[in-house]
Design a protein with these regions (language model features):
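Rossmann-like NAD(P) dinucleotide-binding subdomain of oxidoreductase/dehydrogenase enzymes
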Residues: 1-130
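ALDH superfamily catalytic-core signature
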Residues: 59, 86, 92-221
Length: 221
């Protein structure tokens, strides 16, 4: 079996885990003999630029390049550039569709990790206290800004009411605060825009007859 490098990989990362995302994307690409043009989110460019300075002392020139900017300009240029052989994106579904369209024009390879929320299925014989403990930790990790956040829960009829009550109590006990407050469990969201977006989901849910908000429901200042 012969394995050849793909060539130039354009990697586009989100803002929720900027340093880890960069490491995850660079490692396999470089190990496979490729070069990488990396675009961090315009909201979190500093970690990528710092790591680029460190890599400049280790890797040959041109193996890793970092270009900061917005998706509409820098991102669009990368995915449409004829010199790019592969696109790697971690982002939302709408952006993924645009990338597939762009990649099809020049037959680029693609690697897409698109957004979603992890479902949790709880059967009637489950240990409710253990489930609640896990949900309290992993539903709100990184302020819930995680595509694997356990935010969708499907529970059996027999334990449904108990699970809702216990999970409501657990969620109500979470400490919210500033990012530099060592006592907090959840810090602020990445931006005002994201805060407004999350608040809109709650407001939309509140208008549905079958939805009951059991705790919270109001944005914090």
């Amino acid at each position: 079996i012969r394995r050849d490098p793909v060539g130039v990989v354009a990697s586009i990362a989100p803002w929720n885990y900027p340093l880890m995302m960069m490491a995850w994307k660079l490692g396999p690409a470089i190990a496979g003999g490729n070069t990488v043009v990396f675009k961090p989110s315009e909201q979190t460019p500093l970690t990528a630029l710092k790591l680029a300075h460190i890599l400049a002392d280790v890797l040959p020139e041109g193996v890793v390049s970092v270009i900061a900017g917005r998706g509409q300009t820098v991102g669009s240029t990368l995915i449409n550039h004829p010199g790019v052989d592969m696109i790697s994106l971690t982002g939302d579904v709408a952006t993924g569709k645009k990338m597939l369209d762009a990649a099809a024009k020049t037959v680029k390879r693609t690697h897409l990790e698109l957004g979603g929320k992890a479902p949790v299925i709880v059967f009637d014989d489950a240990d409710v206290s253990a489930v609640v403990e896990g949900l309290r930790a992993f539903s709100f990790y990184n302020a819930g800004q995680d595509c694997t956040a356990a935010c969708r829960v499907y529970a059996g009829k027999k334990i449904y009411d108990n699970l809702v009550a216990d999970l409501t109590s657990a969620a109500s006990s979470i400490v919210l605060g500033a990012e530099d407050d060592a006592t907090n469990e959840i810090g602020p969201l990445i931006s005002q825009r994201q805060r407004d977006r999350v608040a809109s989901f709650v407001n939309r849910a509140r208008e549905l007859n079958h939805v009951q908000i059991t705790t919270g429901g109001e944005a914090m200042d």
